[in-house]
């Protein structure tokens, strides 16, 4: 082989190795950026009827809109809002009639589906040990366009959806407190 051919191959190998190193570094940085520190203190809200508990800041209050949701034609098992100084977190729980689970779908498949539906900033996150699809959508509200972030998960029984206009730096530490439980049986 000619000296220039060997140098060319060596340059390709070095470029490949450098590219792999950069990719590994970016992956490690992204994984570190995904670490979310849960809020400390706060008050725990018991949603065991829907299979979870959630801790919110001490100044938060809770409104139950389930009756209003049903009166407006909604089918939520629970519809409510936890709210405080930093904003509002709407919480919806639905029966999962399809019986599927988010974890049975590949990440790329889910992200592509939501992006094709018009969502932006779509990504998967793990909160409370369960996968969530997280996305942003812009909707036309009474006062013009509004941007909402949704954090959604489902298993074979229940679909849980958190919707908010709060900054992700404020809402993610709250959502990081979610603990999944068995669904409490009601008589």
Give the label of every model feature segment.
Residues 66-166:
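Conserved polar/disulfide-associated segments of primarily extracytoplasmic proteins
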